[in-house]
Regions:
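Non-transmembrane, aqueous-exposed alpha-helical and coiled segments at domain scale
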Residues: 1-149
Length: 149
């Protein structure tokens, strides 16, 4: 989201509520809904439950869409200019710790010890931390594709 906003508002402060966001996946697919919550917080875009505006202005509802026909995972569009950028996350280039999936399986089937549960949580959070802090500016991980002319 940060990279998309930087692209759409170069050198300027993004306009909260001035962005339409479209997700390729359904809101219940994988972690799409979770990601959409973060995107909504940052952009002001909401589906139908957000800020309804004041005096008919500043309505932020109906700016967040799912199951959209977009090329990448998420499309961000400036309402005022129509400029759009598609964003994809290529997360496979940032590996999990080798034990992560075995620990996940134990957590899911209920056989994990408290220590294994804590280790799984730590492994998962370490990868999230690496994605955001070490690879947040990596164009091979977070790919932006301008849309249109």
């Amino acid at each position: 989201t940060l990279k998309a906003l930087e692209h759409l508002y170069p050198g300027a402060l993004p306009q909260r509520g001035g962005i339409r966001v479209e997700f390729r996946e359904d809101q219940l697919s994988g972690v799409t809904g979770v990601i959409a919550n973060v995107v909504a917080l940052l952009t002001g875009a909401t589906h139908d439950t957000g800020f309804k505006g004041i005096g008919g202005r500043f309505d932020r509802r109906n700016l967040l869409y799912f199951s959209a026909d977009v090329a990448e995972e998420i499309r961000y569009t400036r309402i005022d200019t129509g400029q759009s950028v598609d964003v994809a996350a290529r997360l496979q280039s940032v590996p999990f710790a080798p034990q992560t999936f075995a620990l996940m399986q134990k957590c899911l089937d209920g056989s994990a010890t408290p220590q294994e549960t804590a280790e799984f949580r730590d492994c998962w959070q370490a990868r999230v931390r690496a994605l955001l802090l070490q690879h947040g500016d990596d164009p091979e991980v977070f790919v932006l594709r301008p849309v249109g002319p």
